[in-house]
Structures are given as C-alpha cells and as structure tokens.
C-alpha cells in the first residue's frame, strides 16, 4: 500500500489539528485509521503501552513522529494517516521535540512495516524542505500533490 493511495482512499489526513498532549495527537491519527477500518480501537492503547515500555520510540526526526504498534495489536490492513498540529507538542524525546507532524502507520506484518512504510516516509522527507512544505498545506489535495511531486522526483 502506497502512502499517497492510503491517505487518499482512507480520507486519513487531518491538517492543523488541535491537541493539548502528545496522547491526544496520537489519538487523532489512530481515530482516522479506526474510521477507515484499518485498525481496531485497541491499536491506540498498544501505542501508549509501547511508549510506556520503550519511551517515545516513534519520534524519528525533528518535528516528526511515526506512531505505530505491532501487527497483532489490532491491525486489519496496512494503512497510514497524516496529522499536522497547529501547535507543536513535547513527546519527551531529547533530540526531536517538539513534534507537529504525525504519520501513523499500521502494517499487517514486519516486512511491510520496514520496506513499505518506513521507506516511503524516509523518501518523503529526504528533501528536508518537505517538512515546511507539509506544514504549509491547508487541504488534503495539497498534501497529495506534495507526495506526488516527491515521488516524481525520486
């Protein structure tokens, strides 16, 4: 499943969302996937449990979080949601806080998680200007166009 196709088909983009805590921000992304029947509601708690156990493991770059759980923690099919926050939040990551872009990922198996999910997100942000381009997006179509331009340049 391609990042762009998943976001478009599942209508799982939310821009300039308001959240007061990192937990609320993660829930916005998971709720988009629940609404699209990509994950079960328990996927949210699995992500919180992971943070309790391992720390903010999914904050992967300055300003960017990629919340995800394991396939057996409620994943029905592979999919992504993308959330930008109006106000950046602390996720308690010593290097990459504050976060204002969340790409929540659900993968049906570890191989998909590594090869499909992470690689597409790395590709999107290989051009660091895409962080600010994404922050400037105000419509779903602007996000999809940005991903299309990035894929065309790759």
From Swiss-Prot:
Gene Ontology molecular function: kinase activity
Record's comment describing the protein's domains: The PTS EIIA type-2 domain is phosphorylated by phospho-HPr on a histidyl residue. Then, it transfers the phosphoryl group to the PTS EIIB type-2 domain.
Regulation: induction: Induced by L-ascorbate. Repressed by UlaR.
Stated role: The phosphoenolpyruvate-dependent sugar phosphotransferase system (sugar PTS), a major carbohydrate active transport system, catalyzes the phosphorylation of incoming sugar substrates concomitantly with their translocation across the cell membrane. The enzyme II UlaABC PTS system is involved in ascorbate transport.
Protein name: Ascorbate-specific PTS system EIIA component
Tree of life domain: Bacteria
Active site as annotated: 68
Cellular compartments annotated: Cytoplasm
Residues in PTS EIIA type-2 domain copies: 6-150
Modification Phosphohistidine occurs at: 68
Database matches in CDD domains: PTS_IIA_fru
Annotated source species: Escherichia coli O6:H1 (strain CFT073 / ATCC 700928 / UPEC)
Annotated Gene Ontology cellular component terms: cytoplasm
């Amino acid at each position: 499943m391609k990042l762009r196709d998943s976001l478009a088909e599942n209508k799982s983009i939310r821009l300039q969302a308001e959240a007061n805590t990192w937990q609320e921000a993660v829930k916005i992304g998971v709720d988009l996937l629940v609404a699209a029947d990509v994950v079960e509601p328990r996927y949210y708690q699995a992500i919180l449990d992971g943070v309790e156990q391992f720390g903010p493991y999914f904050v992967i770059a300055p300003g960017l979080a990629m919340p995800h759980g394991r396939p057996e923690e409620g994943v029905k099919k592979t999919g992504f949601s993308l959330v930008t926050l109006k106000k950046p939040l602390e996720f308690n990551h010593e290097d990459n806080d504050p976060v204002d872009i969340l790409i929540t990922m659900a993968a049906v198996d570890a191989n998909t998680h590594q090869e499909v999910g992470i690689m597409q997100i790395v590709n999107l942000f290989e051009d660091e200007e895409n962080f600010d381009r994404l922050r400037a997006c105000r419509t779903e179509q602007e996000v999809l166009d940005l991903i299309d331009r990035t894929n065309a340049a790759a």
